[in-house]
Amino acid sequence: MFFIFPLFQTIGYSFTDYNGINPRKEFTGLTNYVDVFQDKWFYNSMLFTGKSVILMILLANVLGFLLALALNTKIKSRNILRAIVFCPFVFNNVTVGFIWQFLLGRFMTDLYPLTGWKVFNIGWLSDSSLVLYSVVFVKLWQSIGYFMVIYLAGLQLLPQDPLE
């Protein structure tokens, strides 16, 4: 119910000129959809989203599995390390976005005059050739703990004798 009603309401709104503020809604038919598919930025956005999803899925699975293998050992601090890796997953997406926007933007530019390191003078979020990797890195940082936990649960179900 909490999913179905808003879904159909949103689909209904997509056939009107409703802007969310003015209560007046006038039926526009498929005009909104025609406008979207004629917009040059729509295809760039879809391509960016597709690339980031593919990179994210591949890297999150590979790195999550490698972390699970590394933390499936009998080292003393494994539980603390597992918690540290999983912790970013519980953060809200908006919070993560603001934190990394500050770190990759303002914080980096403030560090450059102090250190002189060129890595701090790069526009991680403003350079069109780097923004994809910056976004994937941030999302990877946030979600890799989830993938690690899933793989770790699977690894712990395996019998230990063949693994040794």
Name what the model sees in each region.
Residues 1-164:
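A structural signal for multi-pass alpha-helical bundles of membrane permease subunits
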